Amino acid sequence: MSGGPGEAAGVSGRDAETAPAHVLVVGATGMIGGLAARALHRRGASVALAGRNAERLADRARLLGDRPHRAFDAYDLDGCAGLAPWAARSLGRLDCVVVAVGVAGFGRAELVGDAAAEHLMTVNALAPMAVVRGALPLLEAGGTVGVVTGVIVDAPPRGMADYAAAKTALATWLGVVGREQRARGVRVVDVRMPHLDGGFAARAVTGGPPTLPPGADPEASVERHLLAPLAGGTERNR
């Protein structure tokens, strides 16, 4: 990997000027969310962090200057919907929400049990939807939502039917929501993150990953596919 988060993000004067000011990062204990939170903080954004691992979350919040933080469970959809109102209260207002939550799952469709399929749909689709649903009423014109889906939406491989279905459901939902919110001046960015080097596939909820090509650099990918679109004007980034 390259240097620290700020170095890889390529922080410039323009970036600092266009970075959202008050940001909720959901999934801040994961690799993508953690990198995004650190880069946004270095650009001067006031960030609130939400994540599954309470201990890691507290550590990351402390390293960013004792930022507001809240642990959540993706299966608690009401709790997911409540993250944005909590962040708005903690930060004073909310300009942007970054959602980087998910879990991988592998195996032919007939080998994936119903419980695993439900888990994949809940964590990869329903939980992010709930977060966004709770955030939309709080965002004013110029507000932005960035949600990580993945390139699997564009080319779902064999052996990942349930995982791909969940991510595709989320991407479809984001596309419609983006059109609905456009008149309000709120952008919804569908982040088609590439496969990254970071061990995500190895932590699958079911099955084992196939042989995968080398992943992209995480810091550079977060900058290109997530942070740059949030500061710019695109609604989908591949």
What are these regions (language model features)?
Residues 144-169, 174-175, 179-182, 195:
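Catalytic loop of short-chain dehydrogenase/reductase
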